[in-house]
């Protein structure tokens, strides 16, 4: 397979005399001569400071970018939005929650579709951005990988977000004091990562891995860990493999998803 075969889409954007203006703009964001002969890998980051689930994803995106470049591609990072159900629930803000999933899917489809990315790697770690990213990749149906941002570390005495909700209930019942409630509030969520339990994000991560859209063990790694860094770096080699063999989401998720997400064993011929 030639280099041109690996960049069937981006070659339309950057090859030939007529595309000199496009190349000129890409040079401003760091492209050099050799980069125009590499497959372009769109890296969709859901980094945001609106929620701890995604506050570290900018660093993961940089690791993914390095992995893509080292594997012979050219990584291009871009951002898509994210919101937090955990923060907005019970308020008018939840009216935007489900809609955000569609906006995220639209964003991936719009950016990578517009810019001519040959492959796509998305990074997410919250209730709506994870399915939204998958929807965007499926719509474009180009070689794609999802990377889970990873789970958060527990607070003292194995506390997590549920501990805070329970403390609110205990406070209402008179079994948790003001001081105890404040202490749990301040310590239960110590840093980056998705809610520490089999809630929506970790469940989605497991389902996505079962579908074959993320690398093995991606769903079981801490947000801040050497394993998660290696997961990000390995994605570059994996996306190049998908490009070389023209493996796309729709070609395998429709076979794996219904059975694997239910925990059923796949037939040996699958």
Regions from the PLM with identified roles:
Residues 1-35:
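N-terminal amphipathic/basic leader segments beginning at the initiator methionine
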Residues 3-10, 41-48, 82-94, 185-190, ...:
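Gly-rich Lys/Arg/Thr-decorated short loops/hinges at beta-loop-alpha junctions or inter-strand turns
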Residues 9-13, 31, 48-56, 195, ...:
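A short N-terminal beta->alpha junction/helix N-cap motif
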Residues 34-143:
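Long, structured ligand/cofactor-binding scaffold of large enzymes
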Residues 97-252:
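Active-site cavity-forming subdomains of large catalytic enzyme subunits
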Residues 253-260:
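Conserved small/polar residues in nucleotide/adenosyl-binding loops
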Residues 264-270:
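Hydrophobic alpha-helical segments, chiefly the membrane-spanning helices
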């Amino acid at each position: 397979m030639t280099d041109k075969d690996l960049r069937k889409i981006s070659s339309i954007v950057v090859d030939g005399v007529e595309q000199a203006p496009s190349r000129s703009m890409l040079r401003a964001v760091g492209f050099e001569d050799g980069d125009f002969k590499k497959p372009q890998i769109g890296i969709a980051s859901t980094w945001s400071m609106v929620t701890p689930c995604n506050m570290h994803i900018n660093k993961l995106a940089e690791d993914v970018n390095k992995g893509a470049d080292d594997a012979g591609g050219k990584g291009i990072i871009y951002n898509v939005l994210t919101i937090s159900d955990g923060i907005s629930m019970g308020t008018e803000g939840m009216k935007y929650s489900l809609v955000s999933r569609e906006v995220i899917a639209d964003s991936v489809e719009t950016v990578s579709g517009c810019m001519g990315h040959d492959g796509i790697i998305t990074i997410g770690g919250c209730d709506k951005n994870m399915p939204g990213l998958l929807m965007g990749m499926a719509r474009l149906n180009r070689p794609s990988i999802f990377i889970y941002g990873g789970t958060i570390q527990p607070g003292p005495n194995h506390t997590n977000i549920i501990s805070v909700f329970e403390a609110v209930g205990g406070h209402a019942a008179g079994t948790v004091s003001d001081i105890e409630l404040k202490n749990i509030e301040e310590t239960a969520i110590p840093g980056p990562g998705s809610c520490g339990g089999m809630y929506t994000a970790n469940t989605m991560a497991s389902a996505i891995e079962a579908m074959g859209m993320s690398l093995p063990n991606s769903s079981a790694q801490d947000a801040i860990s050497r394993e998660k860094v290696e997961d990000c770096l390995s994605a570059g080699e994996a996306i190049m493999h998908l490009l070389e063999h023209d493996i796309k989401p729709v070609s395998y998720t429709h076979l794996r998803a219904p059975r694997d997400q239910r925990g059923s064993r796949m037939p040996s011929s699958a």
